[in-house]
Amino acid sequence: MVPHRARRLLNPMAVGPLAQQLGSLTVFTRDDFEEEWHLVASGGFSKVFQARHKRWRTQYAIKCSPCLQKETTSSEVTCLFEEAVKMEKIKFQHIVSIYGVCKQPLGIVMEFMASGSLEKTLPTHSLCWPLKLRIIHETSLAMNFLHSIKPPLLHLDLKPGNILLDNNMHVKISDFGLSKWMEQSTQKQYIERSALRGTLSYIPPEMFLENNKAPGPEYDVYSFAIVIWEILTQKKPYAGLNMMTIIIRVAAGMRPSLQDVSDEWPEEVHQMVNLMKRCWDQDPKKRPCFLNVAVETDMLLSLFQSPMTDPGCEALTQKVSCKPSLSQPHKVSKEVNQEIADSVSSDSLKWILQLSDSKSLVASDVYENRVTPLHFLVAGGSLEQVRLLLSHDVDVDCQTASGYTPLLIATQDQQPDLCALLLAHGADTNLADEDGWAPLHFAAQNGDDHTARLLLDHGALVNAREHEGWTPLHLAAQNNFENVARLLVSRQADLSPHEAEGKTPLHVAAYFGHIGLVKLLSGQGAELDAQQRNLRTPLHLAVERGKVRAIQHLLKCGALPDALDHSGYSPLHIAAARGKDLIFKMLLRYGASLELRTQQGWTPLHLATYKGHLEIIHQLAKSHVDLDALGSMQWTPLHLAAFQGEEGVMLALLQCGANPNAAEQSGWTPLHLAVHKGTFLGITHLLEYGADIHACNKVGWTPAHLAALKGNTAILKVLVKAAAQVDVKGGVSCTPLQLAIHSPK
């Protein structure tokens, strides 16, 4: 809440006694805000502006009614301020906060929601399923809160335009003004105004069919169902239809098309569609209340979101630089001929021009790309021609548009004699191209130790870095050129320089599994546990890539087997997740810890379970690890196996002694998750090993509730045979039997 300030009195002619009813609301004027007001939303009866408060330096949203800019005593002004007072009293994380009223212009001052409304987001962004389900769930939480107030507060204008999103795409709903408006309207006026406001699609059929029908909580539930449809399909309901057609269709029991509902949608989304259909039932009495809706959306969201995050795959693209294309010239202008002739004899000129079948140069190539005859002659590889040209006054370090010098070209072409000639004429060994590649980089890339030695003898920087921080030693390690690496090391090259991502030459050699380079670098004193930017060591990379010999050598040399990366993954975690049995055993022999946890709380057993690696699971069980270790959301390995539907893994864990009745933070047991996934054998295994058929999660759902909701008769029969009770409500307001009756399956 913003700081309280002295309230200015409203014009008594405008609001009368309402000035005494504003409670703790602040009264603003336009002068309190900076001059620039940005229009962020516009509807039939209001506009929303973004403005910054001068003193508080904070952005606010100001909802103004264009028709209420003049001071007036109309009932609509009263309605506006009553809405503000009503909204200000509501404090909930998914309800937009009200800070006050604005006198000039007339409006309500609210918190500013950076991501705007859901109405603007749906047509412009492709939302992922977890985000869609979360938006639906958070909207249901907000509506459940409003309906739980005594007396219940009905929204009566629930639509994507009134569902606002913050920076992190979390929901806050707004606009509660329609309730008072409806009380002052006839049914005809209400429908006409709804059409103008764009809310006709969200009106339930009973409002069209019953003249004196007063809206109840079921009204909002119906509107919520249409919102669910819009979120799932990201389309407008009844697009292109006129007002009368919509009214007739809705009154007749027709709803937005379900053609977009695909069999490929996740199971949880199909269950959300089932909930949507129940919420827009033609009979208001059959629509669920928001308390049950919120419970169900919470269940679907929690079941959809696997708490497991895979360790990121390390991707190292082989670094390479290619020489420029020096197109052969066709003709030389008179000016270029004269320019060359001024410094070269006529016989020599003829010789220089004989560079290709066309026996000529192109003037535009020379000038536009800064390619000189010396570049062409070096690229042609003619030592004598280059020697002759260098005997005249030419720039030995001339650079093309991309920064290539003759020495760079000669080095990349592996022409040591040309390199020696250019160096004898003073060529700069450290002049780099536009990517920062010096001649020594190219020599290292090519494995050309002869040229590399020549360059070093003439002052080349052994630790020269290109633009991404790669040194010649990085390139030698990448390309497995042990000869160049030995030369660089003998010239005191830095053994552990970090490139832009933090990789050292040892990281690179370990990644590619170049055992000779790994031995050379480690033997010369390279830092074994150097960390790149994500804190992974060479051992992490070698394990992920399955480079057994590199791993063995690093461990023998003393590399830490328990080093953790930025996500808390050790090499053993990675081996477990990747299913690398031999490497896993090797790490254990060198003392790797079995109980280390990632930042999400996962042990190696969780990761092996998640990926279904039975050999590693048995190896861990033999090592007496905690089979019921709690990870993220207090999930055990058995929870993960049940969630994944891995029946063989579930049986393996149960046979090793895993607890079938462990409950995670929301009270879900492995049996709940197995029922949700529909894994028949997995359910049978759990029941055989003593799973509690009556286990309730924190909101009272039993496995039988889930089976009934899914309409899975076969599983429900198995549960009933195991003594599940289908006519007991437990902690929720409906029994499994009632859910089964409502299920369309």
UniProtKB/Swiss-Prot annotation:
Which key words are in the record? ANK repeat, ATP-binding, Kinase, Nucleotide-binding, Repeat, Serine/threonine-protein kinase, Transferase
Catalytic EC class:
transferase
What is any one GO biological process for this UniProt entry? cellular response to retinoic acid
SUPFAM superfamilies the UniProt entry points to:
Ankyrin repeat (SSF48403), Protein kinase-like (PK-like) (SSF56112)
Upper lineage: Eukaryota, Metazoa, Chordata, Craniata, Vertebrata
> Where are ANK repeat segments found?
369-398, 402-431, 435-464, 468-497, 501-530, 534-563, 567-596, 600-629, 633-662, 666-695, 699-728
- Organism expressing this protein natively: Mus musculus
Task: State the protein's name.
Answer: Ankyrin repeat and protein kinase domain-containing protein 1
Q: Which positions are catalytic residues?
A: D157
**Which GO molecular function annotation, any one, does this entry have?**
protein serine/threonine kinase activity
Q: What is its EC number?
A: 2.7.11.1
Per the similarity annotation, which family is this?
Belongs to the protein kinase superfamily. TKL Ser/Thr protein kinase family.
Give the reactions, separated by semicolons, that this protein catalyses. L-seryl-[protein] + ATP = O-phospho-L-seryl-[protein] + ADP + H(+); L-threonyl-[protein] + ATP = O-phospho-L-threonyl-[protein] + ADP + H(+)
Positions that bind ATP: V40, A41, S42, G43, G44, F45, S46, K47, V48, K63
Matching SMART domains: ANK, S_TKc
